[in-house]
Amino acid sequence: MDRNDDSAPVQAAAEPAEHPGDEKSGKRNVPPALKLVENVVATGEKSPAPASVYDLFKKYHKGEKNGEENVNVNVGFDQLSSDEKSGFLRKLQMLTVGSKKKDGESSQSPAGRLLKKFVPSRRTTPTASASTAKTTSPSRFSVFGRSAKKVSESFSSQKPIHRKQSARRLQFTEKENPQPDAARNKVVAAMTREYEKLSKECAPVPINNKPARVQMQIPRGSLETPTDSPVKSFSSTTTSSSPEKEREKEKEKIEQPRYGTTQRQSVNSQQSSASWHGELPPRDYTSPTFSRKIFVGGVPWDITEAALKDSFGEFGSCAVEWPGQEARYRSGQSNVMPPNANLRAHSKYSGQATTGYVYMIFEDERAVAALLHECSQEIGGAGEWYFKIRAQRSKSTEIRQVQIIPWVTSDSLYCHEESILEVGIEPKRTVFVGALHGMMTAQVLHSIMEDCFGCVECVQLDTDKFKYPIGSGRVTFREHGAYFKAIEIGYLHVHTSKFRKRVQIDPFLESTSCMVCNLEPAHCFCRNRNCFKYYCHSCWSIDHGKDTVVDVHVPVIVPSSATKAYQGHASRHSHLSSNSPSKARDGQNSNNSQFSQLLSPAFPMIVGAPTPTLSALYGYIQNNHTMSPTVYDGPLTPPSSETMSKRGSREFSSNSNGGPVFISPAPVLSSQKLETPIPSYFANSTAILTPTSTYYGSPSTQQTYYAPNVYYGYMPQPIPYDGYVCPPPANYTQ
């Protein structure tokens, strides 16, 4: 025989197992598996053991012989341990994976039949294994489905995939035809049942589909956000088994327009991070009119007032306004500073943090124009200039560049139509904006608010007596939806290449009536989503008198006219005199009648911003804003012979029976167009702070006064005076 010598024992070992009765005839039946000895390529994991089926059988051959070469010896598969059997089958599977079948071939390789003979339990059922063998197309459930005779031909058409993966995983990469019966495999059957179950319960929804919207009716004027409100009834078209997906869907729920004129707007979950990004447009003016006051930033800490006047004095006579200077006036400190005091000393003296800026005030606006001609400006600048000043050091003179921000008076107002100024703005669509940057003009603020919330009718910026902005203003929207959206946001971050600012947005209550009784002027505003209404003092006490400790609604006390605050004070606090009028007379419920009941201006008062430590609740004036109050010694009370009907048409005149009035030259609110010639300080005031009782020379006790900015000053006992509320005279005794 031409076979190798080492194959004879294996051939002999197979005879007794197959045909022991043919020993006499001399015939030897070779097991079919021993015919796979050539051209077998392993494409799965490369085994360190045999490279062919013959070598594999030779490795597992039992070497014990009886000494006679002609005695057949069993391969001994049934004598192997369970680990050896699993290892043998795994290696056999790896060696035979390269035997592929062509279309139309259904015969199995001998190695596949041998593997199925020894391990029938690796299939789900015997019938499933038989049906798999009869199919004409290969599948992942029939690993040994091709004969090894055509291995070289099948691999000649395509290159082998050299991947260090298991044999079964390599079969998954082949292109397969879908199986007609999904129950052939346990995994496929389970997947099919799960798919059918989901198909019956759910309807497919596009990924970008917006959730359904629900119409809800709520009280008039209320506004609710998804983060603060309880979860509303919401019908979803899909059911998700993942809690994370449910939470994501809840965050995406958007409530719709509600009952009344209040429109619900979608708010980001990160409400405080609402922001606007953009650039300020370049300014181009024709014969502009500048304010006499300019901002000077980047000032050295050790610069003195003399050095500033020396640098800016060449353009005209000027004065220096230090940050926090108005705090010393209101706190009773001396206005006399040490000579040659620098910026750090001024900040320390006024009790405020050290700042790097000052204000320069010129006598003539033409000096500001001359200064700007000597300044440098960036191409396309948005209103900032740069000027070099001389800072005197101990042994040398240093040249420093500071920033100059002037103000054009026409930038304080911007309206689409001039007729709005004649008709007047709508207070219920007006919001207050605070903490504005000095480079934000009315037109810039108009563009920002319109981009973020909606159409804007008019923007007004508040200025001081020098017509320089004080960092606050009012924005009137065209629609109520934009107004409520702005109120709900509360804060807007403005990001530009020049600055970053966090702008405050609050309701503006000037000339607004109570939304509960519709009779009294509104004094506060409740931002709680369950209320979101304007209230007078009485209605607030009724609606919020039983607030629990857990649910406390904090009112937004917006500075309005000081006289309105006194009306609310008289109607709310019972300890005042019974003669104090708390309501307008019959038939006089208009604004004219309301102002006719105003507190007489003979009350000694300081009309202006509150102290830095007790500023307005929402920052209606900055702590570093400077105001120099002016004392008017002449009284402004009307004569006793004047009647109520004459007061609305007369002008206030001085007489000798009143107290002084301290009027701040920096009103927070610009003059309002009133029906009666009320002095401007009444319409512009933001607080009333009265001196002590000894100021009047009267022993009358002081009483708490509920000011509009929640600052508790004092006011003497009022007495009736010809139908008016007037202060006690200087010689008044109880």
Curated annotation (Swiss-Prot):
SUPFAM superfamilies: RNA-binding domain, RBD. Residues 16-26, 243-256 have a biased composition (Basic and acidic residues). GO terms for molecular function: mRNA 3'-UTR binding; mRNA regulatory element binding translation repressor activity; ribosome binding; translation factor activity, RNA binding. It comes from the Eukaryota. Keywords: RNA-binding. Residues 259-275 have a biased composition (Polar residues). InterPro entries: CEBP_ZZ, CEBP_ZZ_sf, CPEB, CPEB1_RRM1, Nucleotide-bd_a/b_plait_sf, RBD_domain_sf, RRM_dom. Residues 1-31, 98-185, 220-283, 564-593, 630-657 are annotated as: Disordered. Residues 294-316 form the RRM domain. One of its GO terms (biological process) is negative regulation of cytoplasmic translation. One of its GO terms (cellular component) is nucleus. Residues 121-140, 232-242, 576-593 have a biased composition (Low complexity). Coiled coil: none annotated. PANTHER family: CYTOPLASMIC POLYADENYLATION ELEMENT BINDING PROTEIN CPEB (PTHR12566), CYTOPLASMIC POLYADENYLATION ELEMENT-BINDING PROTEIN 1 (PTHR12566:SF9). Cytoplasmic polyadenylation element binding protein that binds to and regulates the translation of specific mRNAs. This is Cytoplasmic polyadenylation element-binding protein 3. It comes from Caenorhabditis japonica. The lineage of its organism: Eukaryota, Metazoa, Ecdysozoa, Nematoda, Chromadorea. The gene is cpb-3.
